[in-house]
Design a protein with these regions (language model features):
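Active-site neighborhoods and metal-handling regions in enzymes and metal-associated proteins
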Residues: 1-299
Length: 299
């Protein structure tokens, strides 16, 4: 369940952007001969529906129905009491509520064309119960997987999507910078990261940790307290208006910043162990063999 603020900003996601995306989907539908296109969403799989409508569910699940000749309709398992909230935070022609979203979506499509051709993104990943309800709600509907139709449309991000990703990254970066430092426990560091991310507008934030990098570099969710090694890592996974970003930083337990020279020395030692047939043995920190001149390291 998402616990942060879910809102819509027309400045960040204008109607014109959604119109352009929808037009691209409809053009692909026409080329594939589809009468309708379905996208599934829940609080962990919000990206596709959010990309077309701006809608991000805080809980439960829904199906977005995109007819070839009408505006998108959301069939949601959320109760009717959140109808006005859904309408405020997304751009939809209509919201239909019902516990059996597959049956409701299929019935709506079949009412206009009983033998409609329906493409479904990630059909194999759709719950069996929803697929069965789609067949019950529209026995004559022709259902097929349309993942290959939808995926290329999102392969290249538009400026609005890039801007949302940059905002999410800024939230994650700012949050990771709030770790208390010397003497702080792991729990205090995680709490500081989560608090800052939510203050900055994150819809959701998950923090994972590798408490002792010398022993185990795997990042995991921490329950309770864990002893810190000489260095540890924290990863912030942040959602902002349907866009997810994940950033990881490593930290020394004592709060000191390790000199860049130490990192360069470790790199040089590692490179010295490589085969020298291509000249690796001649590597010296701060020098570029290919350029034949001294190069400055970027900070």
């Amino acid at each position: 369940m998402r616990r942060g603020l879910i809102s819509r900003s027309k400045a960040e996601l204008p109607d014109a952007v959604l119109d352009t995306r929808l037009a691209r989907v409809r053009a692909a539908m026409d080329a594939a001969g589809l009468d309708a296109f379905l996208l599934y969403t829940n609080n962990t799989r919000a990206a596709g529906v959010s990309w077309l409508t701006g809608f991000v569910p805080y809980w439960s699940e829904a199906l977005l129905v995109v007819p070839r000749d009408r505006e998108p309709v959301l069939v949601a398992a959320l109760s009717y009491r959140v109808k006005s909230w859904i309408e405020r935070t997304s751009r939809l022609a209509e919201v239909i509520h019902g516990p059996r979203i597959g049956f409701e979506a299929a019935s709506m499509i079949a009412a206009r064309k009983a033998d409609a051709t329906v493409g479904i993104a990630d059909l194999d990943g759709l719950a069996a119960g929803i697929v069965e309800d789609l067949r019950r709600g529209g026995p004559r509907l022709s259902l097929s997987d349309a993942t290959a139709l939808f995926a290329p449309l999102r392969a290249e991000a538009d400026p609005a999507e890039v801007a949302l990703a940059m905002r999410a990254a800024a939230i994650a970066q700012h949050a990771l910078a709030q770790t208390p430092g010397r003497g702080a426990s792991l729990g205090e560091s995680i709490a500081a990261i989560e608090a800052q991310a939510r203050t900055d507008g994150a819809e959701e934030v998950y923090v994972a940790a590798a408490p002792d990098l010398d022993r185990d570099r795997r990042l995991r969710r921490i329950e309770g307290e864990a002893a810190l090694g000489e260095s540890f890592a924290l990863r912030a996974t942040v959602a902002y208006k349907g866009t997810w970003i994940r950033l990881t930083r490593t930290f020394p337990r004592d709060g000191a910043v390790h000199p860049q020279e130490a990192a360069v020395a470790r790199l040089a030692a590692a490179v010295a162990k490589l085969p020298s047939s291509d000249g690796f043995a001649d590597f010296r920190p701060g020098w570029s063999r290919a350029a034949g001149s001294r190069s400055r390291s970027s900070r």
